[in-house]
Amino acid sequence: MRKNRKFLGSYDEIEEIWKRYVQEKTHQNCVDYDDLLLKALKLFNDNPAILKKESERFRWVLVDEFQDTNVLQFRLVEMLSSVHGNLIVVGDDAQSIYSFRGARFENVYDFLAAKDAKIFKIQTNYRSTPQIVELINTIVPEDSIEKQLRAVRMSGPIPVVAETWDNLEEASFVAQRIQEHIDDGIDPESIAVLYRSHYHSLELQMEMDKRKMNFTLYSGPRFTETAHVKDILSVLKVIENPLDQISWGRSLRLFPGVGNATSLRIIQGITAAVNDGHKPVDVVSSHVSNRVKLDKMVSLFGDIGEEEPPSEIIRRFYTDFYGDYLDEKFQDARERRMDVERMIEIAGRYKSISDLLEDLAVSEKIDIERESAEKQPSVVLTTVHQAKGLEWEVVFILAVNPGDFPNSMAIIEGSLSEEERIFYVAVTRAKDYLYILRQKGGRSRPMIGNRYVFRSGHDFVEKLPKDCFERWDVSWDF
């Protein structure tokens, strides 16, 4: 609730849903993952003899990735090692990035305090070049255990901070640089692009599609495959082509009371009207019974004209109707809203609907071709969270700007320690080449800018020692 204050007004409903969920689990004789921990803990607490027997089964208990454990898991580990006291944990508190699912990096400190443990620091880095390791040592989160990594590999290129004007230039630069590395003989699967949130990859997806570059998304569906983007495109398509029956069907079904039968009846009326020279919206009301409330649709499609720029059409549709629709229909509405807001910015670079749809059609066509073709070596596009535990020869980190990375909510709420750890994880994925991208505009989503965020001083790049990287100004140079 603390992180999702919008649900405070629904506390009673959420509590009732939770009660019913618990009852249904009991009724079906089922448990979930949390139950497995809770019931094991209760079993051991209520039955010391069982706990003793289970603990005696093991001479040693070893836990890897200990920084990602939660309170219950830590307590169970303590119990399982209670007879012999031989507990080994391996972890890096600087890489604890899963607090959103209950992970607690403080478990590392609690273990050290409670067990009077011996510490063996594993500080030899076999992955990265000395130049990358030097930069890594400067970004160890402030609240983590002191550590100083040592590189054993041969010298390599110094990390690069590449500055572009906006996210469009960023996408162009990254795509071009990726192609150069591939031309130099690096396997595409040895190249990764990391970002804080999935929406940061949208422009790059479009750019790589235009260049016919293969990529694999670990962070979510492709931009043009998402339901909310398809909804937006359907609205644009019916404005561009009022006879597009498939797009009319998708657009109409967004509105209350319109199902397949009603939408088919409306579409038939629209088709006849357009062929007779009438506007589609003039026909909608007359072909729908009074019980169906389509006031918003009539208003939206009646006011919007084909001559309006696509960004304004999307903005009005989003503001007047679709934003609320997302909130009502999807648990991840916030992420979907970010995608739509990013799409408005992308559309702002196009003068006409047809130009925008033409470029997006390239992505849709390439998606179909990829499905029918044999798997090709692909560059990886992924969030930092999905990249944990992986490594690549070449790593790009997108949008390292205050408000993007670190995340704006973390800045506003003053909870930056996890953002520092996420950045640390991102940088430590690189073996040979590291590119950190930032934008001179200050944020990749200026349309929802916030002065506090811009002036907060929470800029990861500005905190880097100047001798640890090369700064490239790549604006308009490619």
Regions found by a protein language model. Name each.
Residues 32, 129, 149, 259, ...:
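Short, conserved phosphate/pyrophosphate- and ester-handling motifs at nucleotide-, phospho-/glycolipid
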Residues 7, 234-467:
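Conserved helicase C-terminal RecA-like lobe
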Residues 93-97, 102-105, 125-130, 156, ...:
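Conserved nucleotide-binding/hydrolysis micro-motifs of P-loop NTPases
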Residues 472-478:
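Acidic, low-complexity intrinsically disordered tails
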Residues 83-86, 93-94, 114-119, 155-159, ...:
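Short glycine-/polar-rich loops that comprise or flank the Walker A/P-loop
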Residues 94-99, 217-240:
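Short alpha-helix plus adjacent loop in nuclease-associated cores
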Residues 7-109, 124-128:
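Conserved helicase NTPase motor core
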